[in-house]
């Protein structure tokens, strides 16, 4: 309990799943702490930022990745940023769990073929939450 969780999801490409991201983050926050709550902000702007702003985002996100206890990523929507975050997490040996809806995407072979990552397909939120309970060692 009280794990620091880095939640990753496609911000610029996954707008249709912002509500899902919000629900996942809220669920995790019941017992643990999500460092990246902004990913589930249903009111966030996805406009392109300045290079300076993007540099600040990079510095903050990589600091959070180094600080976290575990990475949970929703990868239904392909994202260069999430892919980078996953590689960074692997570099720092953070336990990393990838979720995706099999009916909505074909997950990259670069992720599926990497034995480092724990990968789960899911059908609905309840399936996803059950896996999160196991990952976070909750008494389900």
Predicted regions and their residues:
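Conserved catalytic or regulatory cores that recognize and/or transform ribose-phosphate-containing ligands
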Residues: 1-140
């Amino acid at each position: 309990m009280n794990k620091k969780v880095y939640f990753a999801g496609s911000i610029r490409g996954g707008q249709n799943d912002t509500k899902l991201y919000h629900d996942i983050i809220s669920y995790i926050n019941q017992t643990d702490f999500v460092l990246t709550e902004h990913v589930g902000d249903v009111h966030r702007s996805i406009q392109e930022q300045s290079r300076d702003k993007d540099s600040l985002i990079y510095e903050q996100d990589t600091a959070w990745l180094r600080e976290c206890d575990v990475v949970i990523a929703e990868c239904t929507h392909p994202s260069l940023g999430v892919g980078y975050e996953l590689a960074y997490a692997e570099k720092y040996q953070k336990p990393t769990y990838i979720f995706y809806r099999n009916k909505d995407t074909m997950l990259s072979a670069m992720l599926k073929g990497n034995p480092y990552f724990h990968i789960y397909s899911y059908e609905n939120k309840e399936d996803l939450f059950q896996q999160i309970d196991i990952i976070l060692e909750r008494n389900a």
